[in-house]
Amino acid sequence: VNNLSNKQNISDFLKYLTLLIIIFGIFIRLSQYVSNRALWGDEASLALNIVDRSYAELLQPLDRNQAAPPGFLWIEKLFTQLFGNNEYSLRLFPLISGIVSLIAFYKLGKWAVSAIALPIAIILFACLRYTLYYATELKQYSSDVMIALLLCLLLIPLQQQILNIRRILLIGILGAVAIWFSHPTIFVLAGLASGNLILTSNQQKKAILINRLPAYFLWLISFGSMYFLTIARVMQNNSLQNAWGDEYPNTIFDLLWLLDSFGRFFSRPLGFSTIFDGIAILAFVIGSVFFIKKKPNKFIILMSPVFATLAATYLHKYPFRGRLILFLAPFFILVIAEGIAFLLTSFNHSKHHKYFLIAGITLACLLIAPSLIRAGTFVFYPENKHEIRPVIEYIKTHQKPGDGIYIGDGGPADQFEYYAGKYGYSQSDYARGYLSELVDAEKFYEQGWQQFKNQSNQLKNKQRIWFVFPGLNKKKEPFVKLHLDRIGKKLDYFSQPGAFTYLYQMK
């Protein structure tokens, strides 16, 4: 009786703990959202596309080296029309996606992992850097995660079943619609479908395949339509291709690339830093061994989207890198959590129980504590990136008639352009520079001031110029000032996190 009572108490404690973690995760995301940090360059570039285009035009290749699924863009467009063109409207869908993802991850975790592993998985998912950060960024990666998790909740309970026509149409239509809202949806669908066939007995394989063909057909038609309407044209963007072109394996036998990509995954998109990514890899390996021995079918299902994505990467169709594969993070987190839980609970079954317990506690602390502490600080000190709004306000307040404004081209200039209209500036009031970013500070002087004057009529005959640098590494500020001092005299300076401006009297 006492044992049953203790087990019930532990079970209740774990349930309440998991609930508290979910509430904490939602609270942190809301704190970040309410802090209303300025859009940084990449967000601003996407925002300008959303604001300046019609719904039909959002089907065309985006300007400013941006790419996003049409469904995501349409929701963003709708929110700006309903709630106004501002940061809150633009980040509302990623926020909703982040909160829904927490709940969906909990549901998937209940199916996939043990009761001990579940709160570990939830706290990692809630607090790890990139699952948290992208929940409040104007990008599609938060909704990628949400859609991947929702599709798992939809399809996994239907594995190895002969479905009636209503359910076939349901999964077919929902999958077809999801493809338009998330580019990697096709890998989740293909992976789960393949995993289903692998786990189905040989006698049932043909029946299952024939039964699901209408749904698969709808998925393929939807993906083919979106591919030829949007993705194929995006792939013609040389800048985007160059940005990700080195992220593919050289050959199908490029195992070095595979090992490197596997290792990098734990740093980004999972978000384990420095030595902690190695510890996370260890926990993942332990968890994988546990799954393969105790729950091989679940392991195949969890890893099936990963293998489908890798197949596309080896075909040079989708980069296996960074934020583009954030949607795979939940599956790895579940395995990591089970690895930690295995060590924590093995003391009941091993003569070396103390060592397993110590190892489990150590791994749990090393992997959870840094992310938990970092996430907790956001309650009081929300994360900022490139706070250009106060910089523009300062310029507006201190600007004199005839002053010029110079800002580097690319994302930083898009950031300034997004906010310029809100402060009464038109495009004729500032010049976009010829440098996308000041990566090499020496270029600033070697190109010479003449190029700055010749690039735009707005800069000609300007005696005072405000040089605005959002997104420039703080360490490079002295180099910028050094070169500016050679072409003028500094009159003023103002800085905010991730952005600063110099006012110079030109020689």
What do these predicted ranges mean?
Residues 10-13, 17, 21-348, 353-506:
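Membrane-proximal helix-loop-helix interfaces that form the catalytic/acceptor-binding platform
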